[in-house]
Amino acid sequence: MGVFVFLPLVLPLTAWPVARLAEQRLHPRTATRLLTAVAGVLAVCSTLCLGLLVIVGTAQLPGNPLPDGWSDPEVRAAVPYDEVAGRAAIPALLAVLLSCAWGAWRHARVRRRAVAALAGLPAGPVAVLPDPDPYAYALPGRHDRVVVSAGMLAGLKAAERRALFAHERAHLTGRHHRHLLVVHLAARANPFLRPLRTAVTYTAERWADEDAAIAVGSRRTVARAIGKAALMSRAPLSVTLPAFAAAGPVPRRVAALMRPAPAGRAWPSAFTAAGLAVWGAAAGATVSALSSANSAVTLFAILRAATPV
């Protein structure tokens, strides 16, 4: 197992360049999917390796419930600096699990409150809340709905309203809430993945912007709607529920919409900075997966041999 058990804990650093460059050089749809996949793989691998270290660390504690053979020198020799690393991993894994559980619970609570706020309103794909505060967001579920306040609608013209609805429907169609939830939990599992969470928050909004521009047939109208909504909007309901103007740097989104639409299937050459960043992130995720698999299989074999029959 050796040092391979530590690699997945730091390999998320290999994804930092792609988090910076993908949002600028790739189509938002491609960037969102790529970054979400990389973040998910790296988070799972780093958490798995923490768990392996916890097993070794727990076996050294007096009175632990694990088999006595698991504290043998052969087991401890599988992990460099086993005494320090094993015991440090115990509070680290506990913090990861608590943080992810807290994030998932908050997401579920926001979803429940959002659904409860629609009680008594007519069923349909669009729900208009009689609230003077301007906001709009996509609420996924068994029956996907676009939720918008009366205050938001009052501040937009007819064409801008169409852009708003197209944007939110794009969030629902693309299941962007799943991407946001994955990167949000991944960043809680490993703080080195926070740049990917920030990048996906932006690229998911850009993805919806581009789909909305196609739906309404005017990039300028969508840009104008985003700008006006941003000036009116309050804080987002939740970081894992896509909102029209709250997520992502609005000036950058508007500037992107004022340029020609990005190529849908464009992929950077491996000899460009963006291409190297993509391949670097892919290599990091692959090495992380192989390292965690190698560590898990090796430790399993060692523990099996050390377990009395």
Q: Model regions: which residues?
A:
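Polar-ligand-bearing catalytic/cofactor-coordination segments
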Residues: 14, 18-31, 85, 89, ...
